[in-house]
Amino acid sequence: MPSADQILFVNVTTTVAAAALTAAAAVSTTKSGSGNAARGYTDSDDDAGMGTEAVANISGSLVEGLTTVTAALSTAQADKDSAGECEGAVEELHASILGLQLAVPEWEALLTALVLSVIIVLTIIGNILVILSVFTYKPLRIVQNFFIVSLAVADLTVALLVLPFNVAYSILGRWEFGIHLCKLWLTCDVLCCTSSILNLCAIALDRYWAITDPINYAQKRTVGRVLLLISGVWLLSLLISSPPLIGWNDWPDEFTSATPCELTSQRGYVIYSSLGSFFIPLAIMTIVYIEIFVATRRRLRERARANKLNTIALKSTELEPMANSSPVAASNSGSKSRLLASWLCCGRDRAQFATPMIQNDQESISSETHQPQDSSKAGPHGNSDPQQQHVVVLVKKSRRAKTKDSIKHGKTRGGRKSQSSSTCEPHGEQQLLPAGGDGGSCQPGGGHSGGGKSDAEISTESGSDPKGCIQVCVTQADEQTSLKLTPPQSSTGVAAVSVTPLQKKTSGVNQFIEEKQKISLSKERRAARTLGIIMGVFVICWLPFFLMYVILPFCQTCCPTNKFKNFITWLGYINSGLNPVIYTIFNLDYRRAFKRLLGLN
């Protein structure tokens, strides 16, 4: 039996042969006229006409014969295709107590109807709750949730317009509602499912733009733009689903109850619709969610690093020794207070010495120190001076853009207060400079240590010059600090400063910052997990259906059973019931709105 390619070859051959015979007839007519004129025939026109008529008759006979052969081959191929289709589209019928003829046993029909009805009801309830939550719960009434509403509407139409007819068709094994309703049902099926998938793609793109370009996209994400994008989703879905209604199909002209009501298997449309409905959106969602996952993971790492540095929990970072740095002593009831002033200059790369919150040009640092209960620990070189532990809390504030750094220390004991302040200029090298060196000084104002509370404020103001500096005054006293002063290690008086993570005591501001950061990190971790669940569920639900949808028109020997096809089809439909769960169960506001709507508060 000839193949489709052979039939195409015969058709082309027929056309070429007909054209060649027509051309031969024209040439014959011309030659006949020329020859008769040369021989002086007076009835040359009649002879030429007879020759032309003969050639035309021969041509017509050949064309008719070739056309008959082509028609016969086409009919044979069609018969083969019909015979090659999966037989038993309607399997053995089973009688029911209601007098209906069912495609499956009655118990199986009841179980199928029960399970599928539960899926339909849950899908309807879930998507209605999503829609009502957005419009009735104020925290959810934001622009980006309009995409969720559009998705819920698409899934709701699937549950209302598509699934009930599919239940009846699956149980009865035949379509009892006529050809027009069959075509309308199939079109709604493609329209609603495509819209659901494209809405998932739009949600992915919205999240991607919000993460990669948050400032600009926040301005562009207006109600008008979001509604325009949603309208584009539904319009594109209509363009994908409507071509079969205007002729791009292989549906039979005569339709009976025994005729299967199935999606068209016209190969061109199958490729067109599968690309637009699934494979292109799948590629976009995969790329977008990978980018979102990478960006989220990078932000998590950056924030974790910033949280660690901003609480000054540095791990044994020892700064290089400073030349010409001399400790300054102040007495208080026989005890000593040692103060070392130095310059910490960040050079070209400020990030080597500054925390992320200091890297901005305009910030301030506030700190609060408390007296430890036991601070009589000897130094590493036999020095009996007590060591300090101090926690610095970073609070970002806007300042004037000029190069000026000041340090203020205030100590209160019995109503007495002392202050010390200094200024510095930027240096070009990454080093610690002496207190009395170029750029300023740090003068202690008679600081007294004691058993009271000490407050300190370190404010830094840097201009546009990236090479800023911070003057550091480290005091060894009875307070707690995270900065530990190592006494001079040689006779030259050179000292080193070690920053050691000791016991951390956070103030109220620091606790607030940490709590906000923990909440933010927790949200982003949940978002990253949600991305994996979204993609996993989407692929599991829809990939089997679209693989079957694409393969069957090109595989004449592939004959899956009706039960298998129904299972694969319903696996895709289940995605419409899972979408409201996936996109809302991880959101606290949606859970609160659901409880509020269901009266479970």
From Swiss-Prot:
Residues 1-26 form the signal peptide. It is found in: Cell membrane. InterPro entries: GPCR_Rhodpsn, GPCR_Rhodpsn_7TM, Octopmn_rcpt. GO terms for molecular function: G protein-coupled amine receptor activity; octopamine receptor activity. Keywords: Cell membrane, Disulfide bond, G-protein coupled receptor, Glycoprotein, Membrane, Receptor, Signal, Transducer, Transmembrane, Transmembrane helix. It comes from Drosophila melanogaster (Fruit fly). This is Tyramine/octopamine receptor. Residues 361-465 are annotated as: Disordered. It is a multi-pass membrane protein. It holds the Pfam family 7tm_1. The chain crosses the membrane at residues 113-135, 146-167, 185-205, 226-248, 274-295, 531-552, 567-588. One of its GO terms (biological process) is positive regulation of phospholipase C-activating G protein-coupled receptor signaling pathway. SUPFAM superfamilies: Family A G protein-coupled receptor-like. Residues 136-145, 206-225, 296-530, 589-601 are cytoplasmic. Residues 27-112, 168-184, 249-273, 553-566 are extracellular. Belongs to the G-protein coupled receptor 1 family. It comes from the Eukaryota. Receptor for both octopamine and tyramine, invertebrate neurotransmitters, and neuromodulators. The activity of this receptor is mediated by G proteins which activate adenylyl cyclase. The rank order of potency for agonists is tyramine > octopamine > dopamine > epinephrine > norepinephrine > serotonin > histamine. For antagonists, the rank order is yohimbine > chlorpromazine > phentolamine > mianserine > cyproheptadine > dihydroergotamine > clonidine > synephrine. Tyramine has a functional role in the olfactory system as a neurotransmitter or a neuromodulator. The gene is Oct-TyrR.
